[in-house]
């Protein structure tokens, strides 16, 4: 964990203690609790979709190239459309002029996970596929924060009213949490990445825990990738620190019975959201913001590599 990360957690904990003493009136036992440090998460883009237009000349050139390139598997080929997978199925490519004209949208789409591509494969994809497109841009970016910590012990919520879905594991603990719906401009997933890899017989994870907070951004929201989760909170609230038994009971119910939120009016919801934040020593989203700030320039270079001039980031 970086020194900056330790400082922000220590400062945050102190601020919460001072705030809680004046706002909620907690018991003396709260003052004696140890501050728990969480390792800084690893951050990367996990999925990208780039769309653009192929003019008639470039569509012909690209179709000819793809029909002979050994890195590409081409199918559904017609004069005005084709589908393909490239680089051992790691890249999906689709061109459909008729559908694009009918829906008034760009006619070519390229989908891939940059983490699964080598530098050489990225260069190949940029030079041989993406550079054929005009008026290109991102319509999907996924930000992934990987924590070597057990996030099932945390309580996640948003300040906004969005649909929240929770799936539980065999041990009765939360294993996956969704905020929003898949078709929305922002869809947040918090899930046990280690368990997912185990279920899929994927690469073995050596860490004791591996959880991922994934923020899927679509359409206009991709422009706000560096400022897209200010309303999200991942907390460890201590309901027993509250003085009033009524508040303890309500907070306990809201944490353990999510459906209770739907029975409250807006003002009451806001009251208890603020109370939950005030009785938590840590909000992991502060660590996420710090990590994002430290990596922002590097991530921006990756975006610029795909969008602009041909140059690798350092």
Curated annotation (Swiss-Prot):
GO terms for biological process: DNA replication. The keyword rRNA-binding does not apply. The keyword Magnesium does not apply. Residues 1-25 are annotated as: Disordered. Residues 1-18 have a biased composition (Basic and acidic residues). Pfam families: Rep_trans (PF02486), RepD-like_N (PF22477). Keywords: DNA replication, Plasmid. It comes from the Bacteria. The nicking site of REP proteins is sequence, but not plasmid, specific. Belongs to the plasmid replication initiation factor family. This protein is probably a specific topoisomerase involved in initiating replication. This protein is specifically required and may be rate-limiting for replication of the plasmid in vivo. This is Replication initiation protein.
